[in-house]
Amino acid sequence: MADVTHQEPQGDVTDASTFDTEQLGFMCGIEVHQQLATGKLHSRQPSELFDVTIDSVPEDWPRYARKLRLASGEGGKVDVAARFEKRRNRSFVYIQSPNSGLIELDESPPLSHDSDALDVALTVSAMLGAKPVGAVQTMRKTVVDGSNTSGFQRTSLISTDGTLKTDTGDVGIDVLCLEEDSARKLDTIPTDQGEQVIYNLDRLGVPLIEIATSPDIQTPEHAKETAMALGRTLRDTRRVRRGLGSIRQDLNVSVACGDRVEIKGCQDLGWIPRIVRLEMVRQVHMYRLANELRSSLGLPQLPPNRDRDDIGIESEVAEAVAKHIPLEYTDVTSAFASLSLIHISEPTRPY
C-alpha cells in the first residue's frame, strides 16, 4: 500500500462519502463485551437480573451506604480519574439483591473464577484460533464512579493472537479477557453533602467476555461486518446472555491527521458505519480548524500525519497560544444565578 498519509486529507466535511479511507490513513478496531449465561465470575451467586426500578425495589432488600476514599497506587501516584471523583464528593448506596452477598459488598475476598465462564472463554478462544496464556492472573482496573464496591474491576487475560474471518478480510484478535460487569445505577439524588448515587448489585460480578481486535478493519462497512461476525461467534456457544444490554461494542477510530478516539456503547449494529464516518469527518474537520487558527497567528501547520509531529515545534506553539489564551479562571456564578432551566421538547435536527 502506498504511503498517502503525507497528503492533505481530501473531501468535503459536509459529505462523509467524499472521503477515501485509504487516503485518510483510516484505522479502526472493535472491542466487544458480552455477558455470559453462567454464574457470577468471582462468587458462586447466579447471574440473575431483576426487573426493578428505584420505585419498585422491594423494601426488604438491604441497603448499604459507602463513600470511596482517595488512595495512591502501587507506584505512589494518585489516579487522575480518582482525584476528579473526589472533587465531586459523591456518596453511594448499594441495594443488595437476592443474588448478591458479601463478595459483591466487598466484605469478603473473591473466589476463584467460575469454571463455566472460564470454559466458555476458552471455547471462544479456540473458535478464533487464539492462543491461551500459560496461567490466568487477575488484574485490577481502577473504577471510581461507584459502580463497583471495591473501587476496581477484576479482569483476567485468557488468550491472545487470534483471527476472525470476514468476507472483506481477516481481522486479528489481540486479546480475549474475562472480566466483571458493573452494578446497575438506579438513581442519582442531590443532597446538601453532594450527589448520592444508588446502585443495584444484581449485575455486579456477572462475567463478561471482552474481545479486542487489531486495527485491521478496512472501511466503516467492514466495522459493522466485524461486529456481526464477533456476535455470531459468541452466540454459537449457546452460553451467552441475549437481550438489550447483554452485548456492547466499543469503536476505536483514527485517521492520520487525528488521534485515536474510543466511542463507547454502540448498541445498534446498523449505526456503526455512520458513527465511524462521522468520527472520521470530525477528526478531519478539527485538523483543518486547528491549521486555520494556526495560520491566523502565523504559527507552523500541523502535519497531515500526526506521527510526524515535532515536539519542539509543538512546545513553541503551546507557548504562543498561552499568550493569546491565558488560563485564567473567572467565577460567573452570579451571572447565571437568576436564570431558570426549561425542558426543550422539540426534537433536534439529526446529523
Give the predicted meaning of each segment.
Residues A2-L341, S345, R349:
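Basic, nucleic-acid-interacting segments
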